[in-house]
């Protein structure tokens, strides 16, 4: 009976020590980054912004020209409307309406094209960030890296943002 109790105790000790070993193995090193901070620090971000402004400069200038033309015609209608004949006033109003429609269509197309290009470029930049995060996480021995937007608290020593920024630059 005593031997049975000793054997059971020994079995429990071995079992509990193996459970502790498994628990220690299961502990993972978790870090975090502030993706927005890293994104703002990207040197490529400014280059991409300038490239996009250059790409859409002509279309923006065209919109400004349409807007200026419409403004000129509206001012002419206000200034000379009383002196103009009914047909001329009606013709000018139609032209203003057409310019307004043209402006709205072109502005919407520019907005959509700009948003699409911005999304494409952001996707490329986030890929750069992901690669840098992976590189830093592997180098530092982190199993998981979260974004600050998905967590409540993290010890400052597990913040990898600055290390990721340095890896990108």
UniProtKB/Swiss-Prot annotation:
Signal peptide: 1-23
Keywords: Chaperone, Periplasm, Signal
Compartment annotation: Periplasm
GO molecular function annotation: unfolded protein binding
A GO CC annotation given for this chain: periplasmic space
Superkingdom assignment: Bacteria
One GO-annotated biological process of the protein: chaperone-mediated protein folding
SMART domains attached to this UniProt entry: OmpH
PANTHER family registered for this protein in UniProt: CHAPERONE PROTEIN SKP (PTHR35089:SF1)
Function, in words: Molecular chaperone that interacts specifically with outer membrane proteins, thus maintaining the solubility of early folding intermediates during passage through the periplasm.
Assembly: Homotrimer.
Entry similarity comment: Belongs to the Skp family.
Protein name: Chaperone protein Skp
Native organism: Vibrio cholerae serotype O1 (strain ATCC 39315 / El Tor Inaba N16961)
